[in-house]
């Protein structure tokens, strides 16, 4: 399952980092 963020990716990733750490990894990658 791949999720892509357009704008606010950092905010979303950071905000959901506590619940979905893999999201941040995908965004950073």
Swiss-Prot record:
Name recorded for this polypeptide: Uncharacterized protein YHR022C-A
Protein species of origin: Saccharomyces cerevisiae (strain ATCC 204508 / S288c) (Baker's yeast)
Species classification: Eukaryota, Fungi, Dikarya, Ascomycota, Saccharomycotina
């Amino acid at each position: 399952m791949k999720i892509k963020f357009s704008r606010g990716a950092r905010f979303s990733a950071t905000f959901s980092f506590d619940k979905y750490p893999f999201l941040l990894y995908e965004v950073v990658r």
